[in-house]
């Protein structure tokens, strides 16, 4: 089970919730995120 757990201080990142793309925004909180270019 590979989940996106990259830490990025970029404003362009995809927040994942339960393995699904939840929303786009700043990486903040315990949510896992995957940096998107």
Swiss-Prot record:
Keywords: Disulfide bond, Ion channel impairing toxin, Neurotoxin, Potassium channel impairing toxin, Secreted, Toxin, Voltage-gated potassium channel impairing toxin. Disulfide bonds join 8-27, 13-33, 17-35. GO terms for molecular function: potassium channel inhibitor activity; toxin activity. It is found in: Secreted. Transmembrane segments: none annotated. Its main location: secreted. Belongs to the short scorpion toxin superfamily. Potassium channel inhibitor family. Alpha-KTx 11 subfamily. Has the structural arrangement of an alpha-helix connected to antiparallel beta-sheets by disulfide bonds (CS-alpha/beta). Binds and inhibits voltage-sensitive potassium channels. Inhibits the vertebrate potassium channel Kv1.1/KCNA1 with low affinity. This is Potassium channel toxin alpha-KTx 11.2.
């Amino acid at each position: 089970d590979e989940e996106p757990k990259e830490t990025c201080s970029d404003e362009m990142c995809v927040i994942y919730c339960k393995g699904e793309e939840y929303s786009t925004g700043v990486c903040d909180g315990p949510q896992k995120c995957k940096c998107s270019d």
